[in-house]
Amino acid sequence: MKYKDFTAEDWSYIVFTDEVSVKKSDDVTDFWVFRRLREREKCFPEQVKPKTRNSVSLMLWGCFAGCFKGPLIPLHDTETAEVYIQVLQEHLVSFILETLPENGVFDAIFQQDNAPTHKAHITQHYLEQQEFVVMQFPPNSPDMNPIEHLWAVLKKELYRRFPDTSDLPGGRGAVQRALAERLAIVWEDIGPDTMNTLIDSMPRRVQALIDAKGWYTKY
C-alpha cells in the first residue's frame, strides 16, 4: 500500500475533502431502549422515535489539511461535475496556497472519494489539466477519510448549540440559508485539536485497512 509508511506529519499535508448533507431535523442520534423480558412485545410511544419525512437538507463541501480547516461551502443546487469543478477552482486552490505555501498547489496531495461527480470524465480531465496529485482512495473504505468524523462533530454541535434547528420557519430556501449561517458558526468554532486528533489517527487507520484487506474498519 502506497501510504502505509506515512507518519502523522506526512498525513498533515494531505488535503482531505468531502461533501455532507445536513438535515433540518436531528436524525443523527441513536437511541437505545432497554426492556424487561416480559415487556419485550409491548410498544411504548415514548420509546419510539418518529421518522421525519421530506426534511429540508443542505449539501455542503469542505476540506481540511493538518490542523487547518478550509471553507465550508453550501451547495444550494444539485451537485454536478460542473459545480464540483467550480468549487475546486474557487475554494480548494486558495486554501492550499494559504495553508501549504511551501508545497504549492501542484505539490499538495488532494484526496477525494469515488463519488460519480468526482470520477466524471470532465472532473478527471480538469484535475489532470491542473496537474493535481490525487490520492488513490480505497473504493470500499469511505471510513478512511477522517473528514467523515469532522462532519459528525459538525452535526452534533449544530443540534446541541441550536436545538431549535428542527423548528426553523420558512420555505426550503429560507431554511437552507438559516442552516448555512448556523453551520458556518459551528464550523468556525471547531478547534485545531480536533483535526490534530484525526490526523494522528491516520497511521492506525491505514494499518486497520491493511488488516481488513481493503474492506471496512472500526473507523
Give short role names for the model-derived ranges.
Residues 1-90:
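Extended, low-complexity cationic-aromatic segments
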Residues 10-14, 21, 147-219:
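C-terminal anion-handling pockets and recognition modules
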Residues 17-19, 101-118, 141-145:
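Acidic/histidine-rich, metal-coordinating catalytic segments
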Residues 26-30, 122-123, 147-149:
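Short aromatic-enriched loop/helix-cap "lid" or pocket-rim segments at secondary-structure transitions
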Residues 42-48, 111-114, 128-149, 163-165:
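RNase H-like polynucleotidyl transferase catalytic core
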Residues 85-109:
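Short, basic/hydrophobic alpha-helical segments
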Residues 120-130:
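Short, aromatic/basic amphipathic alpha-helical patches
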